[in-house]
From Swiss-Prot:
A Gene Ontology term for the protein's cellular component: membrane
Post-translational modification: Cleaved by the viral and host proteases. The protease is probably autocatalytically cleaved.
Organism, as annotated: Turkey astrovirus 1 (TAstV-1)
Protein name: Non-structural polyprotein 1A
Annotated positions for site Cleavage: Q168, K169, Q508, S509, Q795, K796, Q915, A916
Amino acid sequence: MAAAAASALGASAPKALAPADGPIVAGLDKLVNLEGVHDLFEAMRGAYGEDPAWKGLMSCDVVYLKDITTAIGVKDTSVGIFRKFSDGCSWCPTGAECFLSMKDLAYMKAQSAKAQRLTASLATTSNLIARAMRAESELKRARDEERKVDARYKDILEHSLAARKALQKELDETRERELHLLKELGKRSSIRTKAFSFFDWLFMAVVFFLFLHYTSAECVKPDFGCLVVNSNLPVPSLTFHDVMARCYNTFGNIVLSSQIDAARLREECEQSANKFLGTHIGDPAHKVWCENRLETLIPVECDSSEFLEIFTSNLNAFMVSVSQFYKTISYYKLDALVTFAFSAALATNKLKMVMVLPLLLVALYLNVPPITVTIASVIFQPLILPFVGFQLVFPNFLPYNLFVAWVWMVCQAFFSSDGVKLLVSVSTALVQVVFLAVWSISVIVLQQLSIPMVAQILLFVATLTVSVGVKFANSTITVVHPDGNTEKVSRVTLVRQSMAKRISQIKQSLTIRGVIPSGPNRFDSIVVVEGQGGSGVGWRFMNSIFTAGHVVQGSKFVTIKSESTQVKVKVKRVIDLFECVDTLVEIPLTKEFQHIKPLRLAKKVEDSYLQLCAFKPDMVEKASYQGWCTIDSGFIFNSFNTQFGNSGAPYVDSDGRLVGMHLGSQGVISQGVVLVDTLKTQFLAQQSQIDDQLMERIIEGTKVSHAAILTELDRMRTKVEEVALVSARVNQLESQLKDLYEFSSNSIKCLSDDIEKMVCAQLFDEINLQSVMEKISALPPTEKLAKLVEVFVEQKKKGKTKRTARGGKHALGKKYLSKAHFSRMRMLTEEEYNKMVEDGFSPDEIKEVVDQLREQAWQNYLIDNDIGEDDDLDWYDDMLEDERLNEEIDRRVEAALEDRGELAYQKIRRTFVDQALIHLITLKKGNWQTTKVECQPEREEAYKEQFQKAVKQEDLTEGTSYAIYSAGDATILIENKEIDHTEIKPVTTGAKTVQEYPKDARTTVATFDDNKKDIVKTKRTTEIVLEQRKKTCRTCGETRPHNHKMCRDRHTRRFCFWCGVVHSDVEGHSRDLKCPKCSAGFANLREMEQHAVTTCSKN
C-alpha cells in the first residue's frame, strides 16, 4: 500500500480542481502534506492499533486522518469512515462520501488510482515473469529435441561415409579392370595397325612399279643435243632460240614431242641464218645448214609409252564395256532381278524372307521401284508387311490402309505384351504406322517422277547420309577441362567455337600498326555519371556501374543518366588502384538500367588498337575514339585527342571486351589504367564446397534401385519436416520470450522511480542470484566473499553492472529493505529540481527537502509492512559494511582479471555535460546544426560570455533547440530558445598555432603552452532528398505510375476470333459482345464464354 495519509489535506488543494465524479486532474497523485500528520498517526496507532476497526481502516488504499477521532479511507471505489465513540471504535466501509468535500474526494481518488496502478503493474510483472520462465522451459525442451535430431543425423552421416568408402573401394577395383582392358585393347590395336601399315606399303609398291615404263636403246640420252620423248601433254611449242639454248653443247636435256614444231623451227632457223650470214633470202645452202643443225640439236627421238597413258586407254575401254552391259540390263530389266535378289538377301529371318518374296513379285509386275521394297524389308516388322503389299496393289486407299494398320498394330502390341514392355511395344507400333505413311508417299512420288534406279539408290544413300550426319553433329559430347570441370556441348558447337577461336587468332596475327581494324562499338554499355564536382562516363560490368574516382569525388550520391532516364543513387564503395592516384568507384545497378549491356573482360592485354567509348561535350550524343595504344606497367597510353567529360570511359579491344578505363589527358598524351586484373580479384567466383558430396551421392545413387531411392526420399522428407517443425517451434519460443522480456521491461519502466528500484532489486535477487546464493549461503564468510568474486568476475566480463554486496546480503539474510536503500533514493525529477532552483531554493534547502521526503518514504514503508523502527537501527553500520565489501570485491575482481590477462576497465558512456564545456543543438526541418566547445579552465569565462551572447531570448517550438554549458559543478541547460552559432568562436589569444579542418564539420584547433588545446567544432547537416525516379512508358508514352506490362498487353494487336480482325484491347471489339442465342450483352469475351457454357438457357 502506498500510504497516502500525507497526501489528503484539502486545505492546501489548488482551486482549479475537477469535481469528484469527473475525471481525475493530472498531478494530484504527486501531492503530499507532512505538517502534523506523522504525530497524529502515531497517536492514533498507539490508541487504536489493536482494534479491528483500525485494521479495517489500514486495509484501505488511501487514508485521510481528519482528527484524533475521525479518519476516512478509500478502497477501490468505496469510501469508508473510522469513528471513535465513547464505547469503542467503529468502521463503516461505505457511504462516507458526504464527510468529504468535492476537492478532498478528488485527492483521495487520485491517490487510490496510483495505488491500484502499482498493484496492477506488480501483478502484470509477476505474470510476465512466470510466462517467460515457462517459455524458457519449453525452449530448453525444444533444444533437447533438436540435439536428439542432430544425433540421429550424425549417425546417418557416419553410415553414409562408410558407404562412401565401400563405393570408393569398388570404384578403384573397376578402374584397375578398366586399365587392364585398355592394355589388352592397345595390344590388339597395335597388331591391327601393323597389318594396315603392311597393306599400305604393299599398295604403294604396286603403284610405284606400275608407273615405271620400259626403255629401249633408242631412249638413251645422247652426248650432244636433247632427247625428244613422245607425249600428248598440252604445253607451248619451243622457238629456234629456245632449242639452241637447251640443246646446243649440252647433255641430258629432255624435250617433249608436243613442244617440237619442225616447220616453225626450219623457218626461224633460215631467218636467223639470213640475218647473220648476210646472204639473200631463200638460199638453198641455208636450208641444208638448218636441217643439219636441227639433226645435231635433236639427234634421238624416244617412241615409248608411259604407264599413265596405258592405264587411261584401258580405263576407257572398260567404261565402254560397262556402258554396253548397262544397256543390256536396261533392255532385259536385269536391274530389277538384281534388286530382287538383294532384297531377298536382306531379310533377317525366314518368316520375313517368305513375306518379302511376294512383295517383290508384285513390285515387278506393277512396275514399282524395287528399291522401295528393299527399304520396306529392312525397316518394317513382319506383322505390318501385309499392309505394305495392300498399299502396293491399291495405292488409292492410303487413309483407310493407315487407319486399319494403326488399329491392328496397337491392339496386337497391347494383347501380346505386359509390364514395362507394353509401353515399348505400343510405341514401336505407332512408329511403324508412321513409317508406313512416309514409305507409301515416297512410293507414289517415285512412280510419278520415273526416277532411274541409280538415282533412287543415290537419293536414298544421300538422305540417309544427311540425316545420320546431322544427328551425329548435334550429338552431345563431354569435354573434360584441365581443372577437372566437365562440360557437355554438341559437336557443332565445339567446331564452331574452335573455328571462331582460330579466326580470332588469325585476325590478331594480321593486326599491323597503321591499319586500323574494324570492331564493334559498345555504346549500349555506357551511361553518364554526374557528381558534385562534374560529370563523366560510366560503364556496366556484371551488376554494377563503374567510373573514375575523380568524377564523383566528395559525392555520396550521384546521378546516372541514360537517354531519357535519370536516377539518383548512393555510391556503393571505392576501390583503390595499384600505383595510381585515382580510384575506381562502384555504383549499384538499379532496375531502371537493367537494359544496359555488361562488358566482359579482355582475354589478352597487349599493345594493339583500342576503342574508347564516350560522349561528346554535350553529354548526349555518343562518340568513339580509336587508335594504337601502348600498355606499360598497367597503364594505357594513346595519342588520339580526347575531350572534357571522357573521364571514366572504357577502353575496349577489337572484340568489344573491356581492357581499361580512361583517366584524363596530359598535353598530347591521354592516359588510362588497365582494369582486367583489378576486376578479376574484386569479383572472385565463389568456390563450390559440395561438389565432392554431390559426386559421391550421384555415384551412390547409381548403385541403388529406384524403389530404395523412393523409400529413402520419404524417410529423409519426414526427418526434414521434423527438423523444420522443431526449428519453427524454437524460433517461435525465442520470439515469444523476447516479446515477453520487452513487454516486461516496458511495464517496469512505467512504475515510479522509488518503487521501480525496489522491484528491480527484488527481481534480480529472485531470478539471477537465487541458485547461486543458495550454494554460497552454506559457505563460511571468507569463502562466501571469494565465491561472490567469481560470480562478479564473469558478470564484469560480460559487461553487466556489478551487483553490490548489499544486494547479496539482502538476498541471503534480510527479509525487508533497510533504511540505507531510502537514504540514496531519488526523490525529485529534473523538472522538479529545475523548478526549485528557479524559485530560489539554495542547495542546502533542496537537500533538506529531499531528506525529509526520504524519511517520510521510510516511515510509510514501515507502516505498510508493519515493521517497527527499532527492528533496523543498524542500517548505517550495514551501509558502511556494504561499502567496505564493495571495495574488496572491486579489488579482487580487478586482480582476477589481471591474472587472466584481460582488461579490467570498461568504456564509460559520457553524457552531453561530460563531453564539452558548451554544446549547442538547433533542430529545424530539413537541416540541423551543432556546435561543441572543449577548452582549458583558463578560458572558461571567455567562452561563457560567448554562450550568453549566442543564446537569444526569442522562444522557439518545443524540442527544436538545446544549449548546455557545463563547467565543473555549474551546469546550465536552456531549451527552446533562438541560438546564434556564429557567436561561438575560438579564443586564440596566446595561442601558438591555430589549425582549421574544413571537412563535413568545420573544426578549429588552437594549441597553447604545454600542448594544451581548445577545440571548437561546428557541423551543419542537411537532409538529402532523393530525386523521384520517373520512367516513361514505351507503349502509351505516359509518365504516371502504372503497370507497364499490362499496358503493353492491352495495346498489343492480336487476331480476334469473335470479330475476325486484328485489334488491341484499347481499340475494342468491332462486333457487339452479345450471346447469339439469348442476345444478352457482356463486357468481355470471358464473361460471354462463361455464360455460353454454364448459364445460357437456350444453348
